[in-house]
Regions:
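NAD(P)H-binding glycine-rich loop region in Rossmannoid oxidoreductase-like domains
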Residues: 41-92
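N-terminal Rossmann NAD(P)H-binding glycine-rich loop of SDR-like oxidoreductase domains
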Residues: 6-28
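Glycine/proline-rich active-site loop of Rossmann-fold NAD(P)-dependent oxidoreductases
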Residues: 146, 158-160, 171-180, 215-225
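C-terminal amphipathic/interface module of NAD(P)-dependent oxidoreductases
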Residues: 2, 6, 269-306
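Mid/C-terminal beta-alpha module of Rossmann-like enzyme folds, strongest
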Residues: 215-265, 299-306
Length: 306
């Protein structure tokens, strides 16, 4: 795929990752067309995943589609919220994939988001793209991940190159988990979660964007790719490093029972789950991380926000 002048359609272009990616794409000379769930303004495409509304002709002239939209998982999971988390990912991916497959002039590549939650809670096991997904019968995020990636099959079957970036914990002060952590940590109220032994697989927002661009422009790249830094850490170490970067103590651990009482299944599947994921394919492809270790990553993203 040519490195210059691509026309890229992006869902979730106003989100944490999408907005940073859009800036980088446009700075590199590419044209970005957001897909929006409202009447489209100039330079936008309107679609509605819930109603199945997206005409294949709307993707004519598009070189690549990057699909990032999906319901946030970061709140207590009611039955309705779990349904929204699942449907927002699977319906949107299937609709895009089917529209791409039916288009007369198809985009050459679909980058369709996934997440490391697909692996489930795996203790100390080192996980690569070759590792099997977690048990869908036992883990909601593993179930969602399997179906989310499978929903892109129509595009894959039509010959389109499909990439699934499996996102880890994205570090940015502008949103996501880190933004929620900053206030208590800055007040000196931070602490490990549960035992603190669970692994956290993280990545800086800069490396998220850089890695997506790399795999997008590499013709030989398809399938799943772990978007995580090469040095995952345990929660207790993440806590200590973040406290150190902020020059604050971290004396207040939060018991697992309290987290489960407040957040239910979400706490078990996200905050307390251990997912030690490695970026095997990115490293094999020669991607050079801007922020391979947690301390320098946190220093950079927090300095950039100040």
């Amino acid at each position: 795929m040519s490195n210059a002048g691509l026309h890229v359609a992006v869902t979730g272009a106003g989100g944490l990752i999408g907005s940073a990616l859009r800036r980088r794409l446009e700075a590199a000379g590419h044209r970005v067309t957001p897909l929006v769930r409202r009447p489209a303004s100039a330079g936008e495409i309107s679609w509605d995943p819930e109603k199945g509304r997206l005409e294949p002709g709307q993707l004519e002239g598009i070189d690549a589609v990057i699909h990032l939209a999906g319901e946030n998982v970061g709140a207590r999971w009611t039955s309705a919220r779990k349904r929204n988390i699942k449907n927002s990912r699977i319906q949107g991916t299937r609709l895009l994939s089917e529209a791409i497959a039916r288009a007369r002039r198809r985009p050459g590549v679909l980058v369709s988001a996934s997440a490391i939650g697909i692996y489930g809670d795996r203790g100390d096991e080192a996980l690569t793209e070759n590792s099997p997904p977690g048990d869908a019968a036992l883990d909601f995020l593993a179930e969602v991940g399997r179906e989310w990636e499978a929903a892109a099959e129509p595009a894959r079957a039509s010959g389109v190159r499909v990439i699934h970036p499996r996102f880890g914990l994205v570090l940015s002060p502008k949103g996501g988990a880190l933004k929620k952590m900053l206030l208590p940590f800055r007040l000196g109220l931070g602490g490990r979660l549960g035992s603190g032994t669970q692994w956290m697989s993280w990545i800086s927002i800069d490396d998220v964007v850089g890695a997506i661009l790399d795999v997008l422009l590499t013709e030989s790249f398809s399938g799943p790719v772990n978007l995580v830094a090469p040095e995952p850490v345990r929660n207790r170490d993440f806590t200590a490093i973040l406290g150190g970067v902020l020059s604050r103590p971290t004396p207040f651990p939060v018991p697992a029972a309290v987290l489960r009482l407040i957040l239910g299944e979400m706490a078990t599947s996200t905050l307390l789950a251990s997912t030690r994921v490695l970026p095997k394919r990115l490293l094999a492809a020669g991607y050079r991380f801007e922020h391979p270790d947690l301390e320098t990553a946190l220093q950079h993203v927090l300095q950039a926000s100040s």
